[in-house]
Design a protein with these regions (language model features):
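Blade-level signature of beta-propeller repeat domains, shared across WD40, Kelch, NHL, RCC1
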Residues: 222-248
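An edge-strand/N-cap motif at the start of beta-rich repeat modules
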Residues: 21-54, 59-70
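Long, well-ordered core segments of solenoidal/helical folds
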Residues: 252-279, 320-335, 424-442, 489-510, ...
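Extended ligand-binding groove/face enriched in aromatic
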Residues: 274-276, 280, 318-466
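Short coil-to-beta transitions that initiate beta-strands within beta-rich domains
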Residues: 31-50, 74-101, 126-147, 170-188, ...
Length: 709
């Protein structure tokens, strides 16, 4: 966490020079305080702001925050006790909280909220509004905000009293949890609530839930204090969290993540997650490999290519070029031209990869996947003996390669050498696929597990469900090849697949939606990234309409995921179609002549994009700076709806607005994950993920003018 704080301080130093026209948003950052910061082990029972400095209390005494450390003041902490109130009815039960509001004392009890009258008499408050009427239970939190409004937290939810009228909130309105422990006001009417399972901030009727290790050292919150800068100091049963909310711009956030990738995620030009030797400690990071180094490097390269197209920054061009040549190396190192490796590592790599991916490993996997490929070694030696490369390459890798090659060719490749290099590698891969009957063929002479794009595969028991996606991908690869190389043979091959094998018809259903086990989230990446090349380079107006239908079919299923990358890809391609219509590209009366009404109906229907970019904006702004993979459990929340789809796995759902929960409240730190998974774990604190998670959707959206900069 210290590294994140340091980087944030650099960003905040430069934020004073933000240009007036740049969009500014608030970025939350959590710093976990424990033994290394001077606090005792265990529970922090109280936190107060004294002379605008935090003071924490535990069973070991009091500790003051001085010069970024907790220092004991050698005073013993006193237990928190509530005063005795005379006259409170016995049926009210135990007093749990109290506040003085407008010259009146209010107490929260086990069985109600009470207001003191004259002569030690008490009146029970029964809050109501247009939606609810409550006899409150377990009123454990009371506070008054900076706008002089009374707030409570109770079993039923939370309430706010303003000018004599109540406004009540439950899970339907956004309250995430209701076993309250405390409340504390901030500035501009903002209020924090602590619960037995996390904390949340209410800001202008918007709820921000802060729970799990990304935000808190322990979910049981004992106390909260807000300082004059708006920083929340949250005391828990296992340490303290400091949550800072600071102004930031998109470009500052991009600079932060580019620095993060370059410092901790660059392995010989390949980009992926890293490993943490010590849980949650990014200072113990170690370079790692993934199954899809090529795809992830391509995505980082695409981010830098879009950045270069926007800014002409030489650094962006350098990083985009480095990514391209890393991808080309993956293709050049293998057993025959055009077969891309998944991964390249030096022979002295710190993990015994072939022992890990042994024959026994293959046998175990075949029990769950009968079509798992039994190949050994999975990391053969390079010809020069200096490297190992991972085989059994999948369609994921191809999707990443082709996605980037088109973008690189169009936006970055300026010299003859660069243009010839991208032309050659695209030709090599595409020729390999054609030569082997539209299959990726490994060094054993057999197709890889996920590398078949041929008609026989589509019409088989093991490939029928991949038909739409893989047919569309193959047509996309051929479109990219035709565009980049200028060779007409690739269009001729594509025409044969369309006319003789109906690949263009299959492509209209480019993604499986049901049963749920077939709707895997990474297929959304493969589908949308491949559609990007297919649509951008398609010259035939009838097929443009067909592929626009395919895009909408693929998009609607994931349109509520709050995935800024998928939103951006859809928005870019839908905008491309709109532009084509405006340019007069389509002559409806000449298209689909068997039914001359069809083309116009499709153009009218799909002319406007269905993207609501509010959710893309929300996600880009709320992507956390901390991309450690945490165990994030949201199954207990009051503001969720479980997915009732037949055959759906347990623990799937979304917010009560029917959209995925906000990005910083779920364990979603990769671009190809399902945002409706309510309990997610991406490494359990032993991996940090690369900043491509922000960089690619941001620069893609900026390049295609989908967000306000």
């Amino acid at each position: 966490m210290h590294r994140i704080l340091f980087s944030m301080s650099v960003i905040l130093y430069f934020s004073s020079g933000i240009c007036a026209q740049e969009t500014v948003f608030y970025q939350d950052v959590a710093l976990i305080n424990g033994i290394s910061e001077g606090l005792p082990k265990g529970s922090i029972d109280k936190i107060l702001i004294v002379d605008n400095a935090p003071m924490a209390t535990s069973s070991s005494g009091q500790f003051e925050w001085r010069n970024s450390k907790w220092i004991s003041n050698n005073k013993k902490g006193s237990p928190t006790t509530l005063p005795n109130f005379k006259g409170i009815p016995k049926e009210a039960g135990k007093v749990l909280s109290t506040i003085h509001y407008r010259n009146t004392t209010y107490v929260g009890c086990e069985n109600g909220l009470y207001k003191k009258l004259d002569n030690n008499k008490w009146k029970q408050e029964l809050p109501y509004d247009i939606n609810y009427s409550w006899a409150l239970k377990e009123v454990a939190a009371l506070t008054v905000d900076s706008k002089d409004r009374l707030w409570f937290g109770a079993k039923q939810g939370i309430g706010r009293l303003e000018k004599g009228e109540w406004k009540l909130f439950t899970g339907r309105e956004g309250v995430p949890y209701n076993h309250f422990t405390c409340a504390s006001p901030g500035s501009k009417g903002m209020v924090w609530f602590g619960t037995e399972n996390g904390a949340f901030r209410v800001d202008d009727n918007v709820f921000f839930y802060r729970a799990n290790r990304r935000w808190l050292p322990d979910n049981h919150v004992n106390a909260i204090a807000i300082d004059s800068c708006g920083t929340a100091w949250i005391a828990t049963r296992n340490g303290l969290a400091k949550i800072v909310s600071q102004e930031m711009t998109y470009t500052e956030k991009a600079a932060y993540f580019t620095k993060q990738v370059e410092e901790r995620h660059n392995r010989m030009g390949f980009i992926c997650q890293n490993d943490l030797k010590e849980q949650f400690n990014i200072n113990t990071n170690q370079l790692a490999i993934s199954d899809n180094d090529g795809e992830y490097t391509a995505m980082y390269g695409a981010a830098q290519a879009f950045r270069y197209a926007i800014t002409k920054d030489p650094e962006a061009r350098e990083l985009a070029n480095r990514s391209f040549y890393a991808l080309k190396w993956l293709v050049d190192i293998t057993h025959e031209p055009g077969f891309p490796a998944r991964v390249i590592i030096p022979v002295d790599w710190h993990e015994p990869v072939n022992e890990q991916y042994s024959r026994e490993y293959n046998s175990r996997n075949q029990k769950n996947d009968p079509f798992w490929k039994d190949i050994f070694p999975r990391f053969p030696l390079s010809e020069d003996g200096n490297y190992r490369w991972k085989c059994d390459t999948s369609s994921d890798e191809l999707a990443g390669h082709y996605f980037y090659y088109g973008i690189y060719h169009d936006l970055v490749a300026e010299t003859k050498e660069e243009r010839e290099a991208v032309k050659q590698v695209v030709a090599d891969i595409t020729d390999h696929l054609i030569r082997h009957g539209f299959k990726l063929v490994d060094y054993d002479g057999k197709p890889t597990r996920w590398g078949s794009f041929d008609p026989d595969y589509f019409n088989s028991i093991w490939g029928w469900d991949q038909r739409g996606l893989n047919a569309m991908m193959m047509l996309s690869f051929l479109n990219v090849a035709s565009h980049v190389t200028g060779d007409t043979k690739y269009e001729e091959v594509a025409e044969k697949l369309r006319e003789e094998e109906n690949y263009d018809i299959y492509a209209m259903h480019a993604k499986e939606f049901f049963p749920p086990e077939n709707a895997v989230p990474w297929d959304n990446n493969l589908g949308l990234m491949s559609l990007y090349g297919l649509i951008n380079y398609e010259k035939n107006p009838e097929r443009q309409i067909m592929y626009r239908i395919a895009l909408e079919n693929a998009w609607l299923h994931i349109s509520k995921q709050k995935n800024a990358f998928w939103d951006g890809l859809y928005g870019a391609m839908a905008g491309f179609f709109t532009q084509k219509v405006d340019e007069g590209f389509f002559k409806p009366e000449e298209l689909f002549v068997e039914n001359p009404l069809f083309a116009k109906a499709c153009i009218d229907r799909y002319y406007e994009s269905s993207l609501d970019n509010r959710y893309m904006t929300e996600t880009l702004q709320r992507i956390p700076l901390d991309l450690i993979g945490y165990d994030m459990d949201n199954t207990h929340r009051l503001d969720i709806l479980l997915d009732p789809t037949p055959g759906q796995a347990k623990g799937m759902g979304w917010g009560n607005d029917t959209y995925a929960l906000p990005i910083d409240e779920r364990g979603h730190v990769r671009l190809d994950r399902d945002a409706t998974v309510l309990h997610d774990n991406e490494g359990n604190g032993y991996a940090e993920h690369e900043g491509t998670f922000y960089l690619l959707p941001y620069y893609l959206a900026a390049y295609h003018k989908l967000i306000k900069q």
